[in-house]
């Protein structure tokens, strides 16, 4: 599963630029143009890092940052404040409100990308790791290779993403709709039964030579990967 970055920026051209550069660095990006919309979206799906503009319609970035820090589920969310306010007093205010870093516009795109990676290394090193392990299964994000008990498992691209998603939270039960969002994305319409087809293919690939089945079906709930 790709590291998720949420960008809350009301300048559409800048939002597009940030999405392009972040996706080129291997991140999954969700762009939001309004502060009030961001507050709702962040409750529905929590990113690994938030890039937040100060001046936003609906709810200001500084107010949104304050609210996020008051909630248990977002109190540790890495936040980079992105703003044209470069005065020392404003930087101090942004950091005191809860931002972890403060970048003043105009900014260097390569420097911002470096700051994003540095913050993720500190706050969530697991999301940048190329190697995932769960039980006797090993998945390498960089080489797109999977091994079980040292034997290579051949997977198609969808089955690879599905396994990666399940391995990101071993033991957690994901509904079909959650798997669709996490593996196929929000903007692609796929019937929920498609999930069953790909889970079946993944099972078949992993369970060679009478290997124990590590994918658990929870009736009426979804699927999980046994750890």
From Swiss-Prot:
Gene Ontology molecular-function annotations: phosphorelay response regulator activity; transcription cis-regulatory region binding
One family name in Pfam for this protein: Response_reg
Residue ranges the record marks as coiled coil: none
DNA-binding region in chain numbering: 129-227
Disulfide bonds: none
UniProt cross-references to Gene3D superfamilies, sorted A to Z: 3.40.50.2300, 6.10.250.690, Winged helix-like DNA-binding domain superfamily/Winged helix DNA-binding domain
GO cellular component, one term: cytosol
Organism: Rhizobium meliloti (strain 1021)
Record-annotated Response regulatory domain positions: 4-120
GO process annotations (BP): phosphate ion transport; regulation of DNA-templated transcription
Keywords: Activator, Cytoplasm, DNA-binding, Phosphate transport, Phosphoprotein, Transcription, Transcription regulation, Transport, Two-component regulatory system
Record-linked PANTHER family: PHOSPHATE REGULON TRANSCRIPTIONAL REGULATORY PROTEIN PHOB, REGULATOR OF RPOS
Matches recorded under InterPro entries: CheY-like_superfamily, OmpR/PhoB-type_DNA-bd, Sig_transdc_resp-reg_C-effctor, Sig_transdc_resp-reg_PhoB, Sig_transdc_resp-reg_receiver, WalR-like, WH-like_DNA-bd_sf
Protein name: Phosphate regulon transcriptional regulatory protein PhoB
Main location: cytoplasm
Post-translational modification as stated in the protein's UniProt record: Phosphorylated by PhoR.
Residue numbers carrying 4-aspartylphosphate: 53
Its job: This protein is a positive regulator for the phosphate regulon. Transcription of this operon is positively regulated by PhoB and PhoR when phosphate is limited.
Cellular localisation: Cytoplasm
Family annotation (PROSITE patterns): OMPR_PHOB, RESPONSE_REGULATORY
UniProt keyword DNA-binding, yes or no: yes
Cross-referenced NCBIfam families: PhoB (TIGR02154)
């Amino acid at each position: 599963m790709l590291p998720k970055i949420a960008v809350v920026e009301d300048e559409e051209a800048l939002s597009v630029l940030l999405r392009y550069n972040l996706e080129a660095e291997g991140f999954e990006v969700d762009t939001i143009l309004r502060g009030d919309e961001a507050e709702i979206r962040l409750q529905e799906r929590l990113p690994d890092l938030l890039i937040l503009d100060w001046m936003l319609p609906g709810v200001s970035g500084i107010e949104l940052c304050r609210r996020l820090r008051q909630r248990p589920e977002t109190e540790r969310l890495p936040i980079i404040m992105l703003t044209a306010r470069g005065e020392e007093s404003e930087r101090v205010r942004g950091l005191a409100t809860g931002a972890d870093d403060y970048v003043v516009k105009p900014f260097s795109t390569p420097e911002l990308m470096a700051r994003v990676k540095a913050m993720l290394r500190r706050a969530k090193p697991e999301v940048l790791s190329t190697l995932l392990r769960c039980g006797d299964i090993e998945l390498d994000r960089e080489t797109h290779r999977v091994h079980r008990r040292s034997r290579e498992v051949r997977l198609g691209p969808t089955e690879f993403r599905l396994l990666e998603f399940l391995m990101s939270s071993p033991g957690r039960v994901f509904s079909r709709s959650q798997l669709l969002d996490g593996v196929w994305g929000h903007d692609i319409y796929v019937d929920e039964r498609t999930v069953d087809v790909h889970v079946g293919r993944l099972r078949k690939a992993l369970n060679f030579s009478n290997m124990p089945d590590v994918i658990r079906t929870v009736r009426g709930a979804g699927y999980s990967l046994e750890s």
